[in-house]
């Protein structure tokens, strides 16, 4: 378990900033304590400094995970967010998409969101902007990337993709053996 290098921090923060923008500072400086990001086996963990000090006594090869896994670095040094980060990203999300009840199951099975399943979308969402996907009951379901801007969504075909799927809470069941 080690701190992230400057390059790793930059890549990770750029990815997280796509979803929460300048609210990124609120993740690190929280009122309930100071939190930090640590790298272990190519996975980035979000952990309080208090727990980090307690874990210092455990050797790195015996440590499975610590805190919440935010994502992992691929072999090409790109950062991929995991669904386990959703609970921390959703409250600070700048751009949100609400999907109709009929489209929820399709999204939870890993499919993209179609215009026919779109309930609402945050105003001024640009194309390829990171969005958090909610049910109509304001329950965070996952996150994705807007395939169309808010203005384009109004005049697009009902079978056109409006949100590209990135991660959803159905992954807890589909990939339970690999999530840490």
Curated annotation (Swiss-Prot):
Which Gene Ontology cellular component terms are annotated? cytosol; nucleolus; nucleoplasm; preribosome, large subunit precursor
One Pfam family from the record? UPF0113
- Which domain of life, per UniProt? Eukaryota
Coiled-coil region(s) at which residues?
none
Where in the numbering of this chain does the PUA domain appear?
94-170
Instruction: Tell me the compartments it is located in.
Output: Nucleus, Nucleolus
Question: Per its UniProt record, what PROSITE patterns does this chain match?
Answer: PUA
Q: Does Nucleus appear among the keywords?
A: yes
Biological process terms from the Gene Ontology for this record are: ribosomal large subunit biogenesis; ribosome assembly
- What's a single GO MF annotation on this record? RNA binding
Q: Which CDD domains match?
A: Nip7_N_euk, PUA_Nip7-like
Its tissue distribution reads: Expressed in muscle, heart, liver, fat, kidney and lung. Weakly expressed in small intestine, ovary and spleen.
Major location category of this protein: nucleus
Q: Does the keyword Phosphoprotein apply?
A: no
Where are the stretches annotated C-terminal domain?
Answer: 93-180
SMART domains, per the entry: PUA (SM00359)
Segments of this protein annotated with the region N-terminal domain: 1-92
In terms of InterPro entries, this protein maps to: NIP7_N (IPR040598), Nip7_N_euk (IPR055359), PUA (IPR002478), PUA-like_sf (IPR015947), PUA_sf (IPR036974), Ribosomal_synth_fac_NIP7 (IPR016686), UPF0113_PUA (IPR005155)
Function of the molecule = Required for proper 34S pre-rRNA processing and 60S ribosome subunit assembly.
Give the protein family: Belongs to the NIP7 family.
Q: What is this protein called?
A: 60S ribosome subunit biogenesis protein NIP7 homolog
What organism does this protein naturally occur in?
A: Sus scrofa (Pig)
Q: What is the lineage of its organism?
A: Eukaryota, Metazoa, Chordata, Craniata, Vertebrata
Gene coding for it? NIP7
């Amino acid at each position: 378990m080690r701190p992230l290098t400057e390059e790793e921090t930059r890549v990770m923060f750029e990815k997280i900033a796509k979803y929460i923008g300048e609210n990124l500072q609120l993740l690190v400086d929280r009122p309930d304590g100071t939190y930090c990001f640590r790298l272990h086996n190519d996975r980035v963990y979000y952990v309080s400094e208090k727990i980090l000090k307690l874990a210092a006594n455990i050797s790195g090869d015996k440590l499975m995970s610590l805190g919440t896994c935010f994502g992992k670095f691929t072999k090409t040094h790109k950062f991929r967010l995991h669904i386990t980060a959703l609970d921390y990203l959703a409250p600070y999300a700048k751009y949100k998409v609400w999907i109709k009840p009929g489209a929820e199951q399709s999204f939870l099975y890993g499919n993209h969101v179609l215009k026919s399943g779109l309930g609402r979308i945050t105003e001024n969402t640009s194309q390829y902007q990171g969005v958090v996907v909610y049910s109509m009951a304001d329950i965070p379901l996952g996150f994705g990337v807007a395939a169309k801007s808010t203005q384009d969504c109004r005049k697009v075909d009902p079978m056109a993709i409006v949100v590209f799927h990135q991660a959803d809470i159905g992954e807890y069941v589909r990939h339970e053996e690999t999530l840490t």
